[in-house]
Amino acid sequence: MTAPTTRKDLMIVNMGPQHPSMHGVLRLIVTLDGEDVVDCEPILGYLHRGMEKIAENRTIIQYLPYVTRWDYLATMFTEAITINGPEQLGNIQVPKRASYIRVIMLELSRIASHLLWLGPFMADIGAQTPFFYIFRERELIYDLFEAATGMRMMHNYFRIGGVAADLPYGWIDKCLDFCDYFLTGVAEYQKLITRNPIFLERVEGVGIIGRDEAVNWGLSGPMLRASGIEWDLRKVDHYESYDEFDWQVQWQREGDSLARYLVRIGEMTESIKIIQQALEGIPGGPYENLEMRRFDRLKDPEWNDFEYRFISKKPSPTFELSKQELYVRVEAPKGELGIFLIGDQSVFPWRWKIRPPGFINLQILPQLVKRMKLADIMTILGSIDIIMGEVDR
């Protein structure tokens, strides 16, 4: 009797786009040899909404509500990048108080984004408890956002030359209380997760990205810093008031999923340090550069006429974009969020190119998952931290 010949059959599996374990509407076509991944092809575009084309037919103030739908978990950063470009094109000065308020809001948004990365990431690899814990702290941040901006998500708070409204009475004390409480929360996460042997088994040495590899693929944010490169745009580009605060760039050498986790956990602690310093040193004065003109107009007897009050007391100005090119960027929670802006002596931009961090970081996924196990795909994908709103735009 002859021995049976072994056959090598490859199996093709679809992951997503409607599966709850996927991060948004991402589809992966995975080719498997048993449990080993032979090939992986990401299919994008399920959430494409033409955001760049919409920008070319809107003024900046009209476009602001749209941008919060890119990365809908860190909306302050998309707003910041949208108004930073026109501010630089028009050389518009931002008052010191407004800059401090922006820094506080950006760092709160960074913490909220990292929290909602941590919970699902832990759930992906089998730990359910942190998923419920992170919502406890995240709700407190959203309460602060709601008090200051009127919205829990999609805040529409930044304006060219400042912010839409000043911080309400008692908000600073409330935020300082949150900072003290949150530091104990981060310590609790580290006690629960960082030295957990089951967690370490799933993430240590999984999805390793070398230093040169990270640069060649154009990675940014925690993906880059976890591979041994100390690069943070808050230190490099010196935007807003970040130079006035004492804080450290978080980075690791290993380049694996554990290193990316440690970078993000460290960033949450550093963000709290920045917020505390900003709250304690926040200066007085106007919260946007048009506010002083409004103060002067209060003396105008027509200011309180019924007809004028009925139309509008606070019209939002429309700025003309000068004829030049500009690339602006901020350090978003997921990496470098950039805008390439071309003005055309019009209120509408001639070209508005978005450089989303998630889209660039996702490119390395097929290379990372090859020769890994099927179960490692969710670990690696989770450690990249993507939001399909900004990947597909």
From Swiss-Prot:
Principal cellular location given in the protein's record: plastid
Keywords: Chloroplast, Membrane, NAD, NADP, Plastid, Plastoquinone, Quinone, Thylakoid, Translocase, Transport
Reaction catalysed by this enzyme: a plastoquinone + NADH + (n+1) H(+)(in) = a plastoquinol + NAD(+) + n H(+)(out); a plastoquinone + NADPH + (n+1) H(+)(in) = a plastoquinol + NADP(+) + n H(+)(out)
PROSITE patterns named in the record: COMPLEX1_49K
Membrane topology recorded in Swiss-Prot or TrEMBL: Peripheral membrane protein
Origin superkingdom: Eukaryota
GO MF, one example: NAD binding
SUPFAM superfamilies referenced in this protein's UniProt entry, alphabetically: HydB/Nqo4-like
Enzyme nomenclature, EC number: 7.1.1.-
Database matches in Gene3D superfamilies: Cytochrome-c3 Hydrogenase, chain B
InterPro entries named in the record: NADH_Q_OxRdtase_suD (IPR001135), NADH_UbQ_OxRdtase_49kDa_CS (IPR014029), NDH1_su_D/H (IPR022885), NiFe-Hase_large (IPR029014)
Top EC class for this record: translocase
GO biological process, one term: photosynthesis, light reaction
Family: Belongs to the complex I 49 kDa subunit family.
Protein name, UniProt field: NAD(P)H-quinone oxidoreductase subunit H, chloroplastic
Species assigned in the record: Solanum tuberosum
Taxonomic path: Eukaryota, Viridiplantae, Streptophyta, Embryophyta, Tracheophyta
